[in-house]
Amino acid sequence: KLKGLRWWVVGLVAIAAVINYIDRQAFGALWPDIAKELFPEMDEDGHKAIYGTISTIFILSYAGGQALFGKIFDWIGTRIGFAISIGVWSIATMLHAFAQGLLSFSIFRSLLGIAEAGNWPGAAKANAEWFPTKERALAQGIFNSGAAAGGIVAYPVIGLLSIYFDWKVIFIVVGILGLLWLLPWMFIVKS
């Protein structure tokens, strides 16, 4: 058994939150390039309207995904719950590379929103399972720090990647981060 396992668990959950925010913010950071390539006939107002529609679909899906994944985590536990949530959101992120317009982006963003929503009920459940009451606020604080760190690093990471790669490759690269996260999660967390 790994010494300090609960701290490994909360650390991995915090890293998942970092990845969550990078995947989520990639669309906004890359939108100018996406809009120019996929919607060259539209003006800036048209690009804003499409971006707004796709972003609204993401948020609506995310809101619905909170309750859905809360139930999933209660039903199957944190180990498999996180594997499903992060596995699906990573694949959904990579699928963005194959989007061709409003419909496909809306579908992939919706899938991303539903699956990314699992990170928060999963973190709450992991804290309750792995930490005594007197340490849960600290554990939640560590997880929340991951979310803040993800918001901080997302745009610089995406910006750096955009120097070397086009938007399609970047969605693949950032999607792979979540799949790589699954390796230590499935190895370390056994219940």
Language-model-derived ranges and their functions:
Residues L30-G64:
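Extracellular/periplasmic helix-loop-helix junction of adjacent transmembrane segments
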Residues G64-L103:
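Conserved MFS/SLC helix-loop-helix module at the cytosolic interface between two early adjacent transmembrane helices
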Residues Q25, I59-A67, A117, G151-I152:
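Residue-level signature of mid-helix packing/kink "hotspots" within the transmembrane helices
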Residues F39, G77, F98-S104, P132, ...:
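Helix-breaking motifs and short loop linkers at transmembrane-helix boundaries and internal kinks
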Residues F143-K190:
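Helix-loop-helix hairpin linking two adjacent transmembrane segments in secondary transporters
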Residues W8-P40:
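Extracytoplasmic
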Residues A92-H96, L112, W185:
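MFS-fold secondary transporters
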Residues F108-A148:
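Cytoplasmic helix-loop-helix junction between adjacent transmembrane helices
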